[in-house]
């Protein structure tokens, strides 16, 4: 059965005023879509704009340019009634399970709050029953409802955060690095829980992360961001087997392999230089200052995200034959003068 597009991002830009006439280009013209029932992984190093993208989808930011459509409707042009319904259908799981829960409220009150705001489940009795159901769905004892956040471990707190996100029966969840603050032993448990809940409830996820090793196990498709730009999008399995963009190749080469024989023989790609500032990004390709395959065309022309292979999109001149040929011919002409 063909999956319908649930959310579509087109030419999204999110710029911030940095004072003194300077602008931070946190997100600078990205486009992608998320199909209903899938998990779309969004990866990249800190500062690449992935969390900002998630906040735009939640309508916490008004985009500088471009738009986001949810079920065909522009989310920043909704009526008040439509906005209220949208806010229920899209929820967030936060990165920090310690800071995202109100320490003054019991778990019961934390879960009840969004239900009461939206007037769900027919009154107090129905909501209390829903609290018990939510706790059990995330693997916690219903007796935990009387406790406060400080009484739980990091993994348990994140499960409470997941339960809170599920309280309004959403369709789409933005998971903003939900496992990065957890112990490695707990990360897999949380990922498996999210996969289980997705299967049971038909959820759609935007899974934001900087660690590609864990994204592999939950994502159907993955988008790779660098300095506010989308540089590659493809199916998860293909990205790990055949990465095309030099930045993606470098990220994947840094993931350790358990087999020492393979680990000793494989080539690790070390990127040169530092991450440029989003206030003053490089001309042309923003990755060119660190790219091991940079060409002169990369300074002059910004690459566009194009389909290099079926279902595999990349923004790199290495895969744009026409542009590369045209520029190479121009260089030869200049050299012969």
Regions found by a protein language model. Give the residues of each.
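Short catalytic/signature loops enriched in Gly
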Residues: 3-5, 23, 235-337
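Conserved ABC transporter NBD signature motif
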Residues: 66-74
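Conserved ABC ATPase "signature" region
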Residues: 74, 116-119, 125-143, 252-253
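Conserved ABC ATPase signature
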Residues: 148-152, 156
């Amino acid at each position: 059965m063909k999956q319908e597009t649930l959310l579509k991002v087109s030419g999204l830009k999110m710029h911030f005023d940095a004072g003194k006439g300077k602008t931070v280009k946190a997100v600078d013209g990205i486009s992608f879509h998320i199909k209903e029932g899938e998990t779309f992984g969004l990866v990249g190093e800190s500062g690449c704009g992935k969390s900002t993208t998630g906040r735009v989808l939640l309508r916490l930011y008004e985009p500088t340019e471009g738009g986001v459509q949810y079920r065909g409707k522009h989310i920043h042009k909704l009526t008040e009634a439509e906005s209220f319904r949208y806010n229920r259908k899209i929820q967030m799981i936060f990165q920090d399970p310690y800071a995202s829960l109100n320490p003054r409220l019991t778990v019961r009150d934390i879960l009840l709050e969004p239900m009461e705001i939206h007037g769900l489940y027919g009154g107090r009795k129905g909501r209390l029953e829903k609290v018990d159901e939510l706790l059990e769905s995330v693997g916690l004892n219903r007796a935990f409802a009387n406790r406060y956040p400080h009484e739980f471990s990091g993994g348990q707190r994140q499960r409470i955060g997941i339960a809170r996100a599920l309280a309004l029966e959403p369709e789409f969840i933005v998971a903003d690095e939900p496992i990065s603050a957890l112990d490695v032993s707990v990360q897999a448990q949380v990922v498996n829980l999210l996969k289980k809940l997705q299967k049971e409830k038909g959820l759609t996820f935007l899974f934001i992360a900087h660690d590609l090793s864990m994204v592999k196990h939950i994502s159907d498709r993955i988008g790779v961001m660098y300095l506010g730009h989308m540089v590659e999008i493809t199916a998860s399995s293909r990205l790990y087997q055949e990465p095309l963009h030099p930045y993606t190749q470098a990220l994947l080469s840094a993931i350790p392999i358990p087999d020492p024989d393979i680990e000793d023989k494989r080539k690790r790609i070390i990127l040169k230089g530092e991450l440029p500032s989003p206030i003053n990004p490089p001309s042309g390709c923003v990755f060119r200052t660190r790219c091991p395959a940079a060409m002169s065309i990369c300074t002059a022309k910004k690459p566009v995200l194009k389909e290099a292979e079926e279902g595999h999109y990349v923004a790199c001149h290495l895969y744009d034959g026409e542009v590369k040929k045209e520029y190479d011919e121009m260089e030869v002409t200049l050299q012969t003068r």
